[in-house]
């Protein structure tokens, strides 16, 4: 096994691979957009099951392979459960994640984009802020970042 690295990031996308594994696209502050495989993440009782949910934000423990990374553990700080409970918020969050995936680059620092995504998700959960306003601010700021 190669050296383990720890990085702060957010799961943008999760897709099943085989019977028990998941392929994740993470946006990390120091490595940009990366692809990681969570082996056994679909098994009941797996420690990686919750960490491989879309919108999960935290510190991920990974090992680098030739083409991708393998996920070995995570300390999730925020699951953004409120986004999944409101269909409109979930749609906006998915839209923001798609933007981040499109504009994110592998191997390039993405701290500003990660911060923007995190703050936008938090803003979606505040009923006082209209979601349309959050969307417009997100779109403007992501264009400035890139």
Residue ranges and their predicted role:
Residues 1-23, 27-146:
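Non-catalytic alpha-helical scaffolds and adjoining flexible linkers that form interface surfaces
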């Amino acid at each position: 096994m190669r050296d383990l690295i720890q990085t702060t990031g957010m799961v943008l996308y999760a897709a099943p691979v085989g019977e028990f594994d998941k392929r994740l696209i993470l946006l990390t502050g120091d490595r940009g957009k990366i692809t990681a495989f969570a082996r056994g993440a679909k098994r009941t009782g797996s420690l990686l099951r919750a960490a491989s949910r879309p919108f999960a934000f935290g510190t991920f423990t990974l090992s680098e392979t030739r083409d991708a990374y393998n996920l070995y553990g995570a300390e999730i700080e925020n699951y953004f459960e409120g986004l999944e409970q409101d269909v409109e918020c979930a749609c906006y969050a998915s839209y923001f994640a798609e933007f981040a995936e499109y504009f994110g680059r592998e191997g390039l620092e993405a701290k500003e984009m990660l911060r923007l995504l995190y703050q936008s998700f938090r803003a979606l959960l505040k009923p006082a802020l209209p979601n349309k306003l959050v969307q417009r601010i997100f779109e403007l700021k992501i264009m400035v970042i890139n």
